[in-house]
Amino acid sequence: MRLFVVPLVMLATCVAHAEPIVVAGMGTLGCATLTAQAPPGSGYGQSSLTMAVFSWVQGYLSAWNVVGIMQSGRFADLTSISTNEQWAHIVGFCQRNPDGFVLDAAREILATRLKMETGAALNR
């Protein structure tokens, strides 16, 4: 029993002093892993993994919009390209950047693909 408790206490100590996590979930999935399991042209609904990745990206883009609207009134129009185009861009980015992450693909969509709009800022 003692041999079990010592490693458990050591593990708890390591977790308690861990660095903060800034990005979690599917955004940390490596591009090589995604492209190995997502054939091009198959759409984001082909598996549980691809649906989870696309859902994470949509949530990331939506959260970016909320912060942008609150701070400056600026937001990305998520309808400026279709969901199929968004998915194709994610897969294409990952094929070109196998060492990248899903987060990187989402950031590139924001920077290069979605139309930016401006409305009234909601500073609070």
Residue ranges and their predicted role:
Residues 14-15, 115:
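Contiguous, function-dense segments enriched for cysteine-driven chemistry
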Residues 89, 93, 105-108:
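Charge-rich, solvent-exposed alpha-helical interaction surfaces
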Residues 98-124:
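C-terminal partner/receptor-binding element of secreted or periplasmic proteins
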Residues 3-14:
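Sec-dependent N-terminal signal peptides
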Residues 21-92:
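Short N-proximal segments of mature Sec-exported proteins
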Residues 16-20:
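Boundary at the C-terminal end of the N-terminal hydrophobic targeting segment
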